[in-house]
Regions:
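N-terminal glycine-rich FAD/FM-binding segment characteristic of electron-transfer flavoproteins
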Residues: 1-207, 211
Length: 212
């Protein structure tokens, strides 16, 4: 509950660099917030995937392993995150500002009625004072990104809704292993409990009509 989550992009059976960069940043954010870092891997043939992930300081790795989850398609992966997040109630979710992240992020944030900031170049933790409402919010995610054609840098906060979601550009954050022997929990989920059959794309084959 209220942890930092990172969605892992899987290229075959390899975790994408942008996701490993986000694990590094996610670990730092979790330390600041005094919470755990969790990651979500959805794909096929993911046995041993934890060896790539846990050394970055991941406390819990959620694994969804099924043939219908690779290659990536929108609906199954959206259902994985939406239904998992309803259970786990994360305070932050990070994913790469990639073709997949730009498709998946808005779907998940819309379903959960949470905010999403795209193409962030920096993430920090800080407070926000809403003078109009007379409220001060602590430990918010500062989602920092270029705006107005890159002429200014905007800092965006989401005080009311969770999770605070952001996509982050590849290569703007360092990828650093925390501890090669880091011990985290691996949770293997039953995909059928999260993804309805109707989400999967079915490829239908038809035989040509016989010639007269």
């Amino acid at each position: 509950m209220n942890n930092v989550f990172v969605y892992l992009e899987i290229e075959g059976t390899t975790v994408a660099d942008v996701s490993l960069e986000l694990l590094t940043k996610g670990r730092k954010l979790a330390n600041q917030l005094g919470c755990q870092l969790e990651a979500v891997a959805a794909g096929n043939n993911l046995a041993g995937i934890e060896k790539q992930v846990l050394p970055f300081g991941v406390d819990k790795l959620h694994v969804f392993d099924a043939p219908g989850l690779f290659p990536y398609t929108s609906l199954p992966h959206s259902s994985v995150l939406i239904n998992l997040f309803k259970e786990e109630q994360p305070q932050i979710c990070l994913m790469g500002a990639t073709v997949i992240g730009r498709d998946l992020g808005p779907r998940v944030s819309s379903a959960l009625t949470s905010g999403l900031t795209a193409d962030c170049t920096s993430l920090e933790i800080g407070s926000h004072e809403d003078k109009k409402e007379g409220k001060t919010y602590e430990n918010l995610l500062y989602q920092i990104r270029p705006a107005f054609g890159g002429n200014i840098v905007a800092t965006i906060v989401n005080p009311e809704h969770r999770p605070q979601m952001a996509t982050v550009r590849e290569g703007v954050m360092k990828k650093e292993i925390l501890d090669a022997n880091y011990k985290g929990e691996v949770i293997k989920h039953d995909v059928a409990n999260y993804v309805p059959e109707t989400d999967y794309v079915c490829l239908l084959y038809t035989s040509p009509s016989p010639r007269d």
